[in-house]
């Protein structure tokens, strides 16, 4: 029964996610990105030399792989894939890049009504995670994302709105899920966000990632020299 439930969750995330995300991009067209004329690390004020040393070292490969492995165990097989937690238990999923209005309805429903927890092997949220928002929020949304995924780029902006609109009831956890078959640059970019974290903690991690999503054209369009 547990395996069947996990497969159902994974299928829902993949199929519905593709349909919704595709519809959003068809409606909005290509996601525009500003011209990049200097590395993100320099733009946000990092020590560029230390950043580049970190990035070349590969020291965060295991950390990113741990995120990927946890996503696979939870049933993730596409991005973005998100799980809604209440009291530490998974009570809903957000398949793909759903719009703000739909996510808000889900949140309101979960806050008002008791939900039967879903059967999934999602790794519990811990201090090792990158969290945005109130750490004591009633609801935590755990997202698995690929930094070169165009759907993830759209959803990243949506999730910022979700946290802002529902503060202090909702927090956002970001976990890496680069898909090398589609976006071979995404894993290295994930390492870059962790190197930013190394210099400035959680706040700088989010600042770097926000800028990366802002400037990347997606689908491997960001040059490595601009990290």
Question: For each of these PLM feature ranges, what is it?
Answer:
Residues 3, 7-15, 19-79, 83-116, ...:
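Cysteine-centric redox/oxidoreductase cores and disulfide-bonded domains
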Residues 48, 97, 163, 167-170:
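Gly/Gly-Pro-rich "capping" loops immediately C-terminal to redox-active cysteine motifs
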Residues 68-69, 126-130, 158-159:
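A generic local structural motif
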Residues 73-78, 133-137, 165-167, 185:
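Extracellular/periplasmic catalytic domains that process cell-envelope and extracellular macromolecules
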Residues 115-124:
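Short coil-to-helix leader/linker segments, especially the first N-terminal amphipathic alpha-helix
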Residues 123-139:
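A short beta-strand-turn-helix
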Residues 134-149, 172-176:
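Short active-site neighborhood of thiol/selenol oxidoreductases, capturing the structured segment around
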Residues 145, 151-167, 178:
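Typically the conserved alpha-helix immediately C-terminal to a functionally engaged Cys/Sec
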